[in-house]
Curated annotation (Swiss-Prot):
Domain of life: Bacteria
GO cellular component: small ribosomal subunit
Protein family per UniProt: Belongs to the universal ribosomal protein uS12 family.
Gene coding for it: rpsL
Cytoplasm keyword on record: no
GO molecular-function terms, A-Z: rRNA binding; structural constituent of ribosome; tRNA binding
Function field: With S4 and S5 plays an important role in translational accuracy.
Keyword rRNA-binding belongs to the record: yes
Organism of this sequence: Granulibacter bethesdensis (strain ATCC BAA-1260 / CGDNIH1)
InterPro entries: NA-bd_OB-fold, Ribosomal_uS12, Ribosomal_uS12_bac
Any GO BP: translation
Stated name of the protein: Small ribosomal subunit protein uS12
Modification 3-methylthioaspartic acid occurs at: D89
Gene3D superfamilies: Nucleic acid-binding proteins
Length: 123
């Protein structure tokens, strides 16, 4: 425990908040190319086959990102846009792929929360 004099001389150093999405480098989104598209299983209480893609970004980072929604058209060499946002039951998945942008198609029959899934307004 420091003395009063030590605190006056040096003070306390505040804890630095760690970056949750380092690969974005402060940008809202980043572009990348899919190097592998596959499914993986979630952590303990849940059970599913979650769709994920390994993406090489324009800044050289390689990250695993989640493909949201039902069905997708992604394959190797697809160009995608990723945003931050982790998937709680998939360890190591800290990014989401944006639907309806670049090579990723939106979801056709989507009625609610359409903006998140790149779906046009139904007639």
């Amino acid at each position: 425990m420091p003395t009063i004099n030590q605190l006056i001389a040096k003070g306390r150093e505040p804890n630095k908040a760690r970056n949750k999405v380092p690969a974005l480098q402060g940008c809202p989104q980043k572009r990348g190319v899919c190097t592998r598209v596959y499914t993986t299983t979630p952590k303990k209480p849940n059970s599913a086959l979650r769709k994920v893609a390994k993406v090489r970004l324009t800044n050289g980072y390689e990250v695993v990102s989640y493909i949201p929604g039902e069905g997708h058209n992604l394959q190797e060499h697809s160009v995608v846009l990723i945003r931050g946002g982790r998937v709680k039951d998939l360890p190591g998945v800290r990014y989401h792929i944006l639907r309806g942008v670049l090579d990723t198609q939106g979801i056709a029959k989507r009625r609610q929360r359409r903006s998140l899934y790149g779906a046009k307004r139904p007639k």
